[in-house]
Amino acid sequence: MIPSKGRPPTQHPVDPLDRVQRGDRVAATARDTATLKDLVETYGDAVLPLALDVTDRAAAFEAVRVAHERLGRLDVVVNNAGYGHFGFIEEVTEAEARQQIEVNLFGALWVTQAALPYLREQGNGHIIQVSSIGGISAFPLVGLYHASKWGLEGFSQALAQEVAGFGIKVTLVEPTGFSTDWSGSSAVRSAPLPAYDEVREQTMKARAARMSRPGDPAATRAAILAVVDAEQPPLRIFFGDGPLALATADYESRLKTWREWEHISVAAHGAEG
């Protein structure tokens, strides 16, 4: 089952539809099933199109119920509904902030909750949460996007420990920059405040440098199948050739700071009882 927001799954940096080509059946969801027309025409009955707004919890439960009823079982659930929001923290409105969290975080939570009873009953299954390098590190201008992905990372790590005994696996896929429309027409942008013009320009230049060699979404197909087919899949895996170096530098910086301030941390514990 593949929930998506607006775009068909093949326009995401993680494309799981090679499962169809090897004989699997897929329930693909979108708010408007017309966006899934090409998939149905290409793959026929192997693709079950379902309408779903992932921010509607009841609708998520109903879509998962229908998918299970029509397909007979759920082997893999791929949560890749999401979009990017560009805006410095001061610029983001309440409505914009709530919508970013509703789609990117709560959407994945509702679909996950809806699928878990079926996966528990059958004694196996794999939940793929499409996160981002933005769930590990953080950059200016996309703070609310980071909040949504860090939340996804947190509940998914907890979930993996909660459901391991039921034979259910959880994997967070963390892509870096790919040649998709993530920062294009599918993105949302807050009204800019002139006070941030200088840092905005610097941020966009840094982003352009990071995106100088974007990844090919088509190459993720074999990667996602390798993760799904693995007997012991990872809890986290990067997609792309840049995230590991970036995350390593980020975590080394955190460790350095934690160690430098360890004496204060320990002092904050207070005297032992």
What are these regions (language model features)?
Residues M1-A27:
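Canonical Rossmann dinucleotide-binding motif of NAD(H)/NADP(H)-dependent dehydrogenases/reductases
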Residues D45, V66-N79, H85:
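A glycine-rich helix->loop->beta "capping" turn
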Residues L52-E62, E94:
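The beta1-alpha1 cofactor-binding region of Rossmann-like NAD(H)/NADP(H)-dependent oxidoreductases
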Residues F88-I89, E96-R98:
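Substrate-binding pocket helix/loop in short-chain dehydrogenase/reductase
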Residues T112, S148:
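Active-site helix of classical SDR
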Residues S132:
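Residue(s) in the substrate-gating loop at a strand-loop-helix junction
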Residues G165-P233:
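SDR active-site lid
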